[in-house]
Amino acid sequence: MTKYSESYCDVLIVGAGPAGLMAARVLSEYVRQKPDLKVRIIDKRSTKVYNGQADGLQCRTLESLKNLGLADKILSEANDMSTIALYNPDENGHIRRTDRIPDTLPGISRYHQVVLHQGRIERHILDSIAEISDTRIKVERPLIPEKMEIDSSKAEDPEAYPVTMTLRYMSDHESTPLQFGHKTENSLFHSNLQTQEEEDANYRLPEGKEAGEIETVHCKYVIGCDGGHSWVRRTLGFEMIGEQTDYIWGVLDAVPASNFPDIRSPCAIHSAESGSIMIIPRENNLVRFYVQLQARAEKGGRVDRTKFTPEVVIANAKKIFHPYTFDVQQLDWFTAYHIGQRVTEKFSKDERVFIAGDACHTHSPKAGQGMNTSMMDTYNLGWKLGLVLTGRAKRDILKTYEEERHAFAQALIDFDHQFSRLFSGRPAKDVADEMGVSMDVFKEAFVKGNEFASGTAINYDENLVTDKKSSKQELAKNCVVGTRFKSQPVVRHSEGLWMHFGDRLVTDGRFRIIVFAGKATDATQMSRIKKFSAYLDSENSVISLYTPKVSDRNSRIDVITIHSCHRDDIEMHDFPAPALHPKWQYDFIYADCDSWHHPHPKSYQAWGVDETKGAVVVVRPDGYTSLVTDLEGTAEIDRYFSGILVEPKEKSGAQTEADWTKSTA
């Protein structure tokens, strides 16, 4: 007899891949702050990923993982990507190395691309979720959604649960995907070579079996992170718009046996007639090979998956590698995929149900964007949802998720459309070969796409949380509003510790007001600094208005000062308290100066800030610059936060200047 149950939750995340886990990790911080917040994450698989899948982590993703406390653990296991080798056919049709270029543009970030298989990345995120949420958030397996109802009339009611989900608990048998007869672990069961009906069949109860418990869940919000064949997206009726090529690629994770000289270096290889290969060196001597296959998709996109075996992929790889030898000593995983670029028309319904990751955009894996873009989707959504659920922000900010991430997804599709066709095309034999791809054009696209692929080039348009119109961009030329606030080295004033300023901007739901105090030893400049500090301590400042009386002054908006003096020329106590220098706290004032073991970083110059007059920069909880103004720009700061934050019932109120000469003992 089927059991039925009923429950309530604030957020239900469907899918425990990279997008779903990132959503859970960001939201776990708000669960820590508000333990009665109920966040659930479900997945139809009985276990997480152990082999294969995505593997590349780009610069911006690593920066975000650092702010979540995850980057160091992942980097300790990952394989570094530093140089890409380009191979093209010579006059005899044999591949030869024609160039080497940096994998990541030098200076673009303190990180550059690394690779580690998805299973290990997910493991680190899962451990972090358990730690931060005190095990309140766990992946529940195997569950599958079967029905979703949305009461749009209740969408704007903050206390309502307008989304009703019906979930079914699956048996272990039905939650273990078929491997299509291959002995090697593979992902053909969820690659885009199969139809939606075929994927659904993998997870249906066997004939004659009874379904498990049915649970009705009343949700405030739902996030669909359930992949390219997203059930959530289809239930919402959102269409994927775009096109597919007839190119088919195979993928191998293997320990190779080869005399190819760059087998442990990232490579882009174009052969004369046999197709192309991309090489991605992995951890533990594994190498990933993206191998273009000779087979093409039939009209309508139908593909016979039984034709794609490891042997077929290896055989084609041997042709492309000629005259070098190539074989596989150990095969860890394989799959095949059909190149296509599609993006859904909408990313949310009533700002109550959202979709993210592959559920709303699909593309080729060549530029290492799939996992990265998916994680950054929910990194963007998570802080906005967290602030709304904890009563700190207005629901209007949720509209900016679709505004920001749909625009980026479309840019990604356009980039991948060009890049994947250049990669899959046959090299031009000469300048008169109009059907072939110019290798010079390919290299140019590769280099130009480097910054885009790194994730550091995102520039969000004007919206509620990104105030370009009011900003005085000339005051911080390189802190471009809408782009991520780039980390630079600084010295912590209290003890002279050299550090990256980005490490101070942990992802915990706080906005930052970064006070570039400039030359604070100058009397005129210090007068400006004191006036700004007096504003922050006043009854009507954004700190006083939006901070609850029972909370620390920096718990909602974190004020951090960076001055351009040498720390020997000014003392911490010279800065006005408590706004800029909270009593007995020492991580609020930093200097752009040299230290015993590091030269002067010239970070003011890197940020494009005048070393005398300074500036004020507001940074969102996800690390993106949202407002640039000066020390007199309090009206702009007031206006920015008034459109986003909600005043608590009991406010912090005005603060009086601390007297450092008196003991509190």
From Swiss-Prot:
GO molecular function: FAD binding; phenol 2-monooxygenase activity
Activity control mechanisms: Inhibited by excess phenol. Heavy metals such AsCuSO(4), AgNO(3), or HgCl(2) severely inhibit activity.
Record has Membrane as a keyword: no
pH-activity profile: Optimum pH is 7.2-7.6.
Record EC number: 1.14.13.7
Stated family: Belongs to the PheA/TfdB FAD monooxygenase family.
Record-given protein name: Phenol hydroxylase
Source organism of this protein record: Cutaneotrichosporon cutaneum
Taxonomic lineage of the native organism: Eukaryota, Fungi, Dikarya, Basidiomycota, Agaricomycotina
